[in-house]
Each structure stands twice: as structure tokens, then as C-alpha cells.
UniProtKB/Swiss-Prot annotation:
Localization terms from the record: Mitochondrion matrix
CDD domains found in the cross-reference section: OAT (cd02152)
Site (Involved in the stabilization of negative charge on the oxyanion by the formation of the oxyanion hole) residue list: T145, G146
Annotated site location: Cleavage: A235, T236
Protein's name in the database: Arginine biosynthesis bifunctional protein ArgJ, mitochondrial
Entry's Gene Ontology molecular function annotations: glutamate N-acetyltransferase activity; L-glutamate N-acetyltransferase activity
Subunit description: Heterodimer of an alpha and a beta chain.
Amino acid sequence: MSARLPALWKRLSSTISPRPAPPKAHHHAPIREAAFPNGYVLTGLHCGIKKTGALDLAVILSTTPKPASAAACFTRNAFKAAPVVVSEEVLQRSASTARALVVNSGCANAVTGKQGMEDAWAMVRATDALLGHSAKESETLVMSTGVIGQTLPICKVLAGIESQSSDSQTKSLGSDFTAWERAAKAFMTTDTFPKLRARTFSIDGREYKMAGMDKGAGMIHPDMGPPRMAGQLHATLLGCIMTDAAVSPRSLQSALTYAVDRSFNSISVDGDMSTNDTIVVLANGSAASDPAAEIDEERDPRTYQIFRDELTTFAADLAQLVVRDGEGATKFVTVSVNGAATYEDAHRIASRISTSALVKTALYGQDANWGRILAATGSVPLSVPIDPTRVSVSFIPTDGSPALPLLVNGEPETVDEARAKEIISVEDLEIEVQLGIGSENAKYWTCDFSYEYVRINGDYRS
């Protein structure tokens, strides 16, 4: 049977010429130093996990006198990696505060048993030591990404962390663009560019800053929730966002949970959930010395909602970078599902379309096969059943030209195939599904499946 596979592959691929992924480096550009939040120092370095010599360890410290409010959303995979379990424990012990984050790439430290847990705690303790004598135990969150089932070269990792101590000649912690960029690069595995963003926003005349980085290109279909939430099963998605706003821990977690559902939990590259998916937010309050300026959902819902919406927009920007860098991807696709009875219904349908291998391969082949979109839509159980006579499907061009209806109120349109191919041949496009049931909408961001995706993942460990 195996001898037939090359011939079968050749026959199946003969009708579509492999196309290289479009250039992606332009999604990363220098950021002015004034855009980064106050009160953070960070770096990225090579400690020896990656054989290539690439950066594989990031250290991020908050320098404010008091610990930063900390919030996180973690994978709901039953096989949670050691750093996920340890970070959940740190947040529980510290009443949702933290002073540091340490991240390694090249080894996931997942399904590594007792040794993996010991190694994750060792990374926490080593980073805690960088904070000085005033630091309490367990003020560091930890994240890892890479191959599952392999243990960390922990001596190399600890040496890398210790190289950032105050008396070390190799200390490289900083707050300029280079420091932020090196940290972002240390997150990377199969990523083709570092994913780093920063922005400034105002609430009631007070200026705040927010910066963040994430990584991910494969094994991307997150379903993350707050610490200790039980959930269902589904390369890793890791991300961190730092702000100099003062936000109460409870409100920060509430805002992050809302934001993640509309950003990182709304992307898919290949439909596979990682054991390590983690998003962390630190809010150190360095922009507001007045305790009354702390953002709190119960005390001032209006101010909280402004912050929550800023965080959601920023998180969506970071999440979309992951899809744009999807392994072998040639297209960035927005899936919009409108007119559902509930947001959850719209989100489930958008997720199903975004993970359909048939839809994703049709996108790569530039085939306007809307029947696959409709089949995916109809396969999802909803709180209010679909009425097929109300459903419409369209391609939305990204150049501002008119939409191309494919199905209108359950009736197929006579499609201009040349126009459809023109729309689907560009890098960015949107699929819109109108259910005609209610007023709730949801978006998902996905990419196509290419031959290159198969090659990357077939060779991942070699």
C-alpha cells in the first residue's frame, strides 16, 4: 500500500500547481519606543533548547513596586502541559497578581510527568530570584511551546534565566524596541515572523499604553478559559499583553475572558487544540499613581467597558497575525456569520466553516464551491434551528467592490465563475453567511490548507 502513495499523491496533485505562500515579513515592522507601556523590562536570548541557535527563552519583568494584576486564559485540553498547571497554581496562590513571565520555545514540556512539573517550578523560582529580595515566592508565570513529550534541558534554561540577574555581565533586559522584538522572537517555533504590536489609548483624558506579542502557526484552534475551568477536548498559541493601566485583578480576568472569546478563541489554522495554549495579561498600573484611577467593573462599569473593548480590539489584532502566519497558508479568510439567534450559535457555525478541510482546500484551489460552506453551516446543532429558506451565502471582496451572492434565501444564484475566482484568488477575502434568524453575529479568522502545510508537519520533528 505504501508503495502506491507517491503515485497517488502525484495523481491527486496534478490538477493544482503548488503555490508558495505570499511574503509575510511586512506584518512585522519597527515600533516607536514611546508606544510601549511603562514599567516593563524584557529580553529574548538563546539558552540552548533550539539546535539552530535561534532565540528560545524570553524573560519579562514588571518593575513597579507593587505586583501587577494578572489574568490568564488557558487551554481546556485534558492533557494540560506542566507550565499551564503551574501558572494556574501561581495565580491561585498570588490572588491573581504577578511580577514576571518566563517563556521557552522549542520544547512544550507537555506530557512529561513529574519531571516536567519540577522543571516548570524551577523556571518560576529562577525568575522569581531576578526580582530581588523583596519578591515573594511564586510571582512568575511560565509558558512553553514546542514538541510534546520531551523534557526540557533544564540546566540550560536555568542558566539562561540566571544570566539576567542584576550582577550578570550578560544581562540584556531592556525596554526599547529591540528588547521587545527579541522577546517576541524567542516565542517563535514554526512562525515566519515575530508577532509584536503596541498601541496607545485614552480613557477620560488619561493616556494608557498596551503592548503584546504572540506566537503560533500550526496546531491552532484554541479553546481557552479562565484558570481551573473544566472543558472539552479539542504549534501552540502563546501570547502575552502588558499594559500600564491600573485594573483590579477580577476585572482584568473578566475583560480578558471576554476578549479571548472574540479573538484567540475565534481563530483556526488546522482545527487542532494544543496542550499549552495560554494568554496572559499583566496590568502594572504605572500610568496611574492615584488608587482611585484603578479600573474596576463594579465601581465604574463604563470605564471598564472602554478598557475591555480596547483589550478586545488589541487581542483580535494579535490573533489575526497567527492566522496570517498559518503554516503554508496562502490566504487569510474572515468568516462572518450574521443573523443568528445567539452569539454562541453564530460562533459555532463560524468555527465549523473555518475548520472544514473541504472548505479550506477549496480556498487553496481557488474553487468557489459554496456547497461546502453550506454543508458545514448545516452540520451545527443550534439553539434555534436553521430555516434553509432564509440562508444566504456571499463572497465579500476586500477591495471594496460589491459582494458576490452565491445563495440567496436558500436559492442558488447564477454565479459568475470568473468573478468568483477573481475574488478568491487574492490573499484576503471574506465569507459571509446570513442565517435570517435573529440579530447576533460572530466572526472567525482562518486560512487555507496547502501542500506546504503537509510538508511542514510531516517534517516537524526531523
